[in-house]
From Swiss-Prot:
It holds the Pfam family NPH3. Transmembrane segments: none annotated. Keywords: Cell membrane, Cytoplasm, Membrane, Phosphoprotein, Ubl conjugation pathway. This is Phototropic-responsive NPH3 family protein NPY2. The keyword Membrane applies. The keyword Electron transport does not apply. Pathway: Protein modification; protein ubiquitination.
Length: 634
């Protein structure tokens, strides 16, 4: 740190212990100056020769023969006035970055200009600032920090602007010319670990200045960053790194995505300023930092404009995000645990970039302007879209654990990435299964719409094994999973595809998703939507073993396993159809009979018996038809 000594006489200021300061001198004091409760007993001649303010005040008090002057409004208080008084007496005064602003403002208040006396205090301080302090990196930052208590006078004296300009100029210097000390704690360089103290002995990073600027208050920090952007062409990554460092330093808990209790107004100002200072270049800041800013914006209840700006920026690089970073807590008073709507906006912004269009203005033959909208190819790579789909699938699994999350919000987020072709739907299946597990009371329509999102053909063998044994899924989905696993096993061994009953097979082959059966009659829809009973689930579970045996056995054994599996599926569907028809007949004409001797339990037992009979009939009838059909094809 640089300093300057002014004067040559010894310091002869004394105190009597009662806030009274005096100069030890043979001459008695002839003027008393009061400064905020402290009294200075001094002499007129040295003070009046350099201070125009005291001359004016003393001339007005002499008329009443009063030699007491009150200057409690002087900047810097008693300490700054004492420094100015010592300069008037010629005593040694030491100025540094810590007290130069207070002394400069006090000298301005006292009117210690060159017009009063050549070589006055103001002139000497200005020379010290321009020739020494403003040429030092850390001293300039300290001087700028000390101007805060003396606003607006320090601003009027251009001390603030001069400091900001000096700091920005230093930050824009080529790194090869950086020869001063700075704070940089990101990583220890090899030269530092070996004990090398010379700055020239190591490479200077481009963001060498970012940590030192974190000492500034947000209003000064904003002005310095803006000045840096104006003075030199720095990469957006450097500015982004500076904003990131400031956020981590100034916002408690920001690195962990939380906001500790404190001055919310101050935190809000910092967050909104950081968002405003974000570089325009894409990828100048990481997606993780942007999401932390968005979480902080939500916590301090910033305006929608700030949120929308962050949503647009995050949507441009969503492929960099992780699932944990997308878990944005809802504001207080919200029913849901996470702000799902905000994440959906981000996903929609990401997908919007893949649907760009361009308006081209042309002149026709008559001279009129004609606008033509041309669709341009998307700018998103397949890898980026797959990464986003993977993250959203994991995000869906996590938010599905919230018991208060409506099914509509879960489905809306999942549907926002349905246009992305994914090689596997295992993660989506896990998310749907988690939601069904945590929300057993959802409606049949919601369950249908949710299962429609999943393509059974893209489930792995492990996922298929789990799905067939999953009693939370509708029977229709279970049958689809089993059928497509049969098809996959048949294709891998070169055997023929197993047959299904007419209508059901056509529907399954035409689509692999759950919601593609609009042409199926209503009665069939009800049968599909039904959840399998315990007996039916046990029958379906046994088919998984057959799927694995198919690959190990030959073509003949596979055909037999396929026939058996499909026959059992038929029997399950037939049993439900017979049961459904019986219930319909009873509801139309058997109301009185049901109210008579037979109760609900007797009806159920009859239905179960009918189902068993239908199963036996299907088991004996259908395999022969399937085998006959296979022979005719071969």
């Amino acid at each position: 740190m640089k300093f300057m000594k002014i004067g040559s006489k010894l310091d002869s200021f004394k105190t009597d212990g009662n806030n009274v300061r005096y100069v030890e001198n043979e001459l008695a004091s002839d003027i008393s100056v009061d400064v905020e409760g402290s009294r200075f007993c001094l002499h007129k001649f040295p003070l009046l020769s350099k201070c125009a303010c005291l001359q004016k005040l003393l001339s007005s008090t002499d008329k009443n023969n009063i030699d007491d002057i009150d200057i409690s409004g002087i900047p810097g208080g008693p300490t700054a006035f004492e420094t100015c008084a010592k300069f008037c007496y010629g005593m040694t005064v030491t100025l540094s970055a810590y007290n130069v602003v207070a002394t400069r403002c006090a000298a301005e208040y006292l009117g210690m200009h060159e017009t009063v006396e050549k070589g006055n205090l103001i002139y000497k301080i200005d020379v010290f600032l321009s020739s020494s302090l403003f040429r030092s990196w850390k001293d300039s930052i300290i001087v700028l920090q000390t101007t805060k208590p003396f606003l607006p006078l320090s601003e009027d004296l251009k001390l603030v602007s001069l400091c900001i300009d000096a700091i920005a100029t230093k930050a824009c210097v080529d790194v090869s010319h950086v020869e001063w000390s700075y704070t940089y704690n990101k990583k220890k360089l090899a030269e530092e670990n070996n004990g090398a103290d010379s700055i020239k002995a190591r490479d200077v990073p481009h963001d060498w200045w970012v940590e030192d600027l974190c000492e500034l208050e947000i209003d000064y920090y904003k002005r310095v960053i803006m000045n840096i952007k104006t003075k030199c062409i720095l990469g957006g990554e450097v500015i982004g790194e500076a904003l990131k460092a400031y956020g981590y330093r100034r916002l408690s808990g920001f690195n962990k995505g939380v906001m500790e209790q404190g001055d919310l107004v101050k935190h809000k100002t910092i967050i909104e300023t950081l968002v405003w200072l974000l570089p325009a270049e894409k990828n100048s800041v990481s997606c993780g930092f942007l999401l932390k800013l968005l979480k902080a914006v939500t916590m301090v209840n910033s305006g929608e404009v700030v949120k929308e700006q962050l949503v647009r920026r995050i949507g441009q690089q969503l492929e960099e995000a992780s699932m944990a970073e997308l878990l944005i807590k809802s504001h207080q008073g919200s029913e849901t645990l996470y702000d799902v709507d905000l994440v959906q906006k981000i996903v929609m912004e990401f997908m919007r970039r893949d649907k760009n269009s361009e308006i081209e203005v042309q002149d026709d033959e008559d001279g009129f302007e004609v606008q033509e909208v041309r669709k341009l190819p998307g700018i998103l790579s397949e890898a980026s879209k797959l990464m986003v789909a993977k993250v959203i699938d994991s995000y869906l699994t996590e938010i599905a654990k919230d018991p208060n999350l409506p099914a509509s919000k879960f489905i809306d987020v999942a549907e926002s990435v349905t246009s992305i072709p994914r090689p596997a739907h295992d993660a989506l299946y896990r998310a749907i299964d988690m939601f069904l597990k945590e929300h057993p009371g959802i409606t049949k329509g919601e369950k249908k719409r949710m299962c429609k999102l999943m393509d059974c053909r893209k489930l792995s063998v492990e996922a298929c094994m789990h799905a067939v044994q999953n009693d939370r899924l509708p029977l229709r989905v279970v049958v689809q999973v089993l059928f497509f696993e049969q098809v996959r096993a048949a294709a891998s061994s070169g055997s023929s595809t197993p047959d299904l009953p007419r209508g059901m097979g056509r529907e399954l082959r035409s689509c692999g998703t759950y919601g593609s059966s609009r042409s199926v009659p209503t009665v069939m829809e009800d049968e599909w939507e039904a959840v399998a009973t315990e007996e039916e689930m046990r029958a379906l579970k046994s088919e998984i073993a057959a799927l694995k045996l198919q690959e190990e056995s030959g073509r003949k054994s596979m055909d037999r396993a396929g026939v058996t599996a499909i026959s059992k599926i038929r029997s399950l569907i037939m049993s439900k159809k017979i049961f459904g028809k019986k219930v319909q007949l009873q509801s139309k004409g058997g109301g009185e009979k049901n109210n008579g001797g037979g109760g609900g339990g007797s009806d159920s037992s009859e239905s179960l018996g009918s189902m068993n009979a239908a199963e036996e009939t299907a088991k004996t009838a259908t395999p022969s038809r399937n085998l006959t059909r296979r022979v005719s094809v071969s």
